A protein has these predicted regions:
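Short, glycine/charged-enriched hinge/interface segments at domain edges or termini
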Residues: 1-81
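Short glycine/threonine-rich loop/turn motifs
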Residues: 47-171
């Protein structure tokens, strides 16, 4: 008999988590078959306090900073929360950073990570992370990977941006 291995295991785990989230009633498939959060909140207009949860040493963070500076987006205060964005310890690190951000009196949180392989981005498909995102009081934008990348974090967030820099434009 044949067994899925490698990327096949990841795909099976992804589908299983999608099914659990649908069964729990917190996410459902849209007309295109993409899983989306039930009850997604609208993004605040002209947010004054924006949290950015990402690795402060990442290219994604550098790109976000450059986008903020070049866009003249100086009406908002940006508060950064450093976290791991890859590896087995990343989900717990992201959950901790999101907890800090959610209690910081922000108008919106951006969860950001640049592109990478399916394995590199896998931490954003963690069930505990998904449940943390669903529990946030603060609206959240998931800006993980590139346009072709899709994660559970995208599904359970209030808004998905196709890239970290696009999240600034989406504000």
């Amino acid at each position: 008999s044949m067994k899925e291995a490698g990327a096949g295991d990841l795909d099976a785990a992804f589908r299983a988590l999608c099914a659990r989230l649908e069964k729990a009633g917190v996410a459902r498939r849209n007309i295109n078959g993409v899983l989306q959060k039930v009850g997604a909140r609208p993004m605040p207009r002209l947010p004054k306090r924006v949290g950015i949860v990402t690795s402060l040493s990442s290219a994604a963070f550098a790109d976000i900073k450059q986008r903020i500076e070049s866009s003249g987006y100086f009406l908002s205060k940006f508060i950064c929360f450093d976290t791991l964005v890859q590896g087995k310890d990343a989900p717990a690190s992201i959950i901790e950073a999101l907890s800090l951000a959610d209690n910081a009196g922000l108008d919106v949180i951006i969860l950001a990570r640049g592109g990478g392989s399916k394995e590199d981005l896998w931490c954003f498909n963690d069930e505990n992370l998904a449940r943390k995102i669903l529990s946030l009081k603060t609206p959240i934008i998931s800006a993980v990977g590139h346009e072709i990348d899709y994660s559970i974090s995208d599904s359970v967030s209030d808004h998905r941006s196709i890239t970290p820099t696009a999240a600034i434009a989406d504000l």
